């Protein structure tokens, strides 16, 4: 049974790598039929749904994963990113803060929090979070690009 599950997850991963997300979902569903509480399958299923623009379904999958492991940092970041896309910035920040409570040096959570804060109109605070993210990982592209964008927005407003 475990071998079959692993094979399904590998096939789903390969399909995602090829951009065949719809077919990958079928494999994740089969994997979850075998092991309904498989956290990896839930997370990857959620990411795949997100890639397809099925954000509410992705959110449900992340919430299901969090019901199994409430403090899973990857799931919290993924849930936050979906909430951000859905323009639920305060809820997204809540997810990123939960990650930062466990790992204050998490560059992704810092940068994503900066993005949500920026969307809420607080560019100086957003810049602060992008800079913190870059202190944790100086090569983090998202933080670098977001920092430059936020600075340009501030400059154009002045």
PLM features per residue range, with description:
Residues 17-18, 51-52, 85-86, 119, ...:
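Register position in tetratricopeptide repeats
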């Amino acid at each position: 049974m475990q071998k079959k599950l692993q094979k399904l997850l590998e096939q789903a991963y390969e399909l995602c790598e090829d951009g065949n997300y719809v077919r990958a979902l079928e494999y994740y569903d089969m994997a979850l039929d075998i092991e309904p509480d498989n956290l990896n399958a839930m997370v990857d299923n959620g990411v795949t749904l997100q890639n397809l623009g099925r954000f509410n379904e992705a959110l449900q999958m992340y919430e299901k994963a969090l019901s199994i492991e409430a403090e899973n940092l990857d799931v919290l970041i993924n849930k936050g990113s979906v909430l951000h896309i859905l323009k639920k910035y305060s809820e997204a920040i809540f997810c990123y803060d939960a990650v930062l409570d466990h790992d204050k040096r998490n560059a992704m959570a810092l940068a994503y929090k900066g993005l949500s804060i920026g969307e809420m109109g607080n560019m100086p605070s957003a810049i602060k979070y992008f800079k913190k993210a870059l202190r944790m990982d100086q090569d983090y592209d998202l933080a670098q690009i977001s920092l430059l964008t936020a600075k340009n927005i501030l400059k154009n407003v002045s």
